[in-house]
Amino acid sequence: MSLGESLMKPTAMLYRNLVAMEVEESIRGYPIDAVVLLGGCDKTVPAQLMGAAGADVPAIALTGGPANPAIFRGRELGVGTDLWGYVNELRAGRMSQSDFDELEAASMPSVGHCPELGTASTMAALTE
């Protein structure tokens, strides 16, 4: 299950709740006594916890941890914050598509959740 929340309307929280319902129904739909939750985002981890709580089964949650910092042309990027600024630069014609493609390729250099100190890190710490 994944939330591709780019430009989501009306709100990403609606989709977090839908994922929580999907997790709960997936747990209820199989004859299991407990569940291991693997997640790593500020919406998916809470959704998994909400779903497991709703299904009322024992659960262990493991988060993926933060990704390595993203570097673009010698500058560290905030994946969630800086990327939106570059999208605006692209839309305004101040950045070429090939430069944006290069930025996009550099934006997530390893596995893990968004590396900046944000809600994904907070949710991982709270979950652990």
Per-segment meaning from a language model:
Residues 13-128:
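Active-site cavity-forming subdomains of large catalytic enzyme subunits
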Residues 1-14:
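Anionic-ligand anchoring segments at beta-strand to alpha-helix junctions in alpha/beta enzyme folds, i.e.
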